[in-house]
From Swiss-Prot:
<keyword id="KW-0368">Histidine biosynthesis</keyword>
<dbReference type="GO" id="GO:0005737">
    <property type="term" value="C:cytoplasm"/>
</dbReference>
<dbReference type="GO" id="GO:0000105">
    <property type="term" value="P:L-histidine biosynthetic process"/>
</dbReference>
<keyword id="KW-0963">Cytoplasm</keyword>
<dbReference type="GO" id="GO:0005524">
    <property type="term" value="F:ATP binding"/>
</dbReference>
<keyword id="KW-0547">Nucleotide-binding</keyword>
<protein>
    <recommendedName>
        <fullName>ATP phosphoribosyltransferase</fullName>
        <ecNumber>2.4.2.17</ecNumber>
    </recommendedName>
</protein>
<comment type="function">
    <text>Catalyzes the condensation of ATP and 5-phosphoribose 1-diphosphate to form N'-(5'-phosphoribosyl)-ATP (PR-ATP). Has a crucial role in the pathway because the rate of histidine biosynthesis seems to be controlled primarily by regulation of HisG enzymatic activity.</text>
</comment>
<dbReference type="InterPro" id="IPR001348">
    <property type="entry name" value="ATP_PRibTrfase_HisG"/>
</dbReference>
<keyword id="KW-0328">Glycosyltransferase</keyword>
<comment type="subunit">
    <text>Heteromultimer composed of HisG and HisZ subunits.</text>
</comment>
<dbReference type="InterPro" id="IPR018198">
    <property type="entry name" value="ATP_PRibTrfase_CS"/>
</dbReference>
<dbReference type="GO" id="GO:0003879">
    <property type="term" value="F:ATP phosphoribosyltransferase activity"/>
</dbReference>
<comment type="similarity">
    <text>Belongs to the ATP phosphoribosyltransferase family. Short subfamily.</text>
</comment>
<dbReference type="InterPro" id="IPR013820">
    <property type="entry name" value="ATP_PRibTrfase_cat"/>
</dbReference>
<comment type="pathway">
    <text>Amino-acid biosynthesis; L-histidine biosynthesis; L-histidine from 5-phospho-alpha-D-ribose 1-diphosphate: step 1/9.</text>
</comment>
<keyword id="KW-0067">ATP-binding</keyword>
Length: 214
């Protein structure tokens, strides 16, 4: 009998792009996730279950071995403190950029910078690598307000079209990292459940290649 495999999926935009990809890989929930309040779903494979989580929780569930696989954005993985997972595959969906941004045309001050972001770990590492002294302020939303209101000189945030920045008088500055959705696996599970994991990984890999070949 095959060992049960649990795949942790991120809520939101990523979920909307992940489900069609999984369907191409012949992994389909037995009920409509969008119409259910459930968080755990059976699939057309008796040994595969899907769990719907907040994006930032996906690496934690995989790291602790509660989920075998996880689907999460690279931005979330960069910010997570994990030791027990492998990043196996770039799913090449939900693409965007992690960037610095500031008020249009406003030069940076000649002092220690103030930076607002929800990506504290990544922002600190980036400015340290650049040799720039910066205090990073943790925010949870509406990043665009921080430079406008004088809370910060720059923000570090996800940029898709850039329209939200432009609408608030901001401009994207420096690219920190291109972001896309990744498939991760628990290290122990990859060894103990290899015979179950590898076929699924191959199906998903082919689905990604099929998407790219369009």
């Amino acid at each position: 009998m095959s060992k049960t495999l649990t795949i942790a999926l991120s809520k939101g935009r990523i979920l909307g792009e992940t489900l069609p990809l999984l369907e191409k890989a012949n992994i389909v929930p037995v009920e409509d996730i969008s119409k259910s309040r459930k968080l755990i779903f059976d699939t057309n494979h008796e040994h595969i279950k899907l769990v719907i989580l907040r994006a930032t929780d996906v690496p934690t569930y995989v790291d602790h071995g509660v989920a075998d696989f996880g689907v999460a954005g690279k931005d979330v993985l960069m910010e997570a403190s994990t030791k027990n997972l492998y990043e196996l595959l770039d799913l090449k969906i939900a693409k965007c950029r992690l960037m610095t941004a500031g008020v249009v045309g406003q030069p940076l001050p000649n002092r220690r910078l103030k930076v607002a972001s929800k990506f504290i770990k990544t922002a600190k590492a980036y400015f340290a690598e650049q040799g720039i002294q910066a205090d990073v302020i943790k925010l949870y939303g509406a990043m665009e307000l921080a430079p406008i209101m004088g809370l910060a000189d720059l923000i570090v945030d996800i940029v898709d079209t850039g329209n939200t920045l432009k609408a608030n008088g901001l401009e994207a500055r420096e690219l920190i990292a291109p972001i896309s959705t990744r498939l991760v696996v628990n290290k122990a599970a990859y060894k103990t459940k290899y015979s179950e994991i590898e076929p699924i990984l191959e199906m998903i890999r082919r689905a990604v290649e099929d998407n790219e070949g369009k």
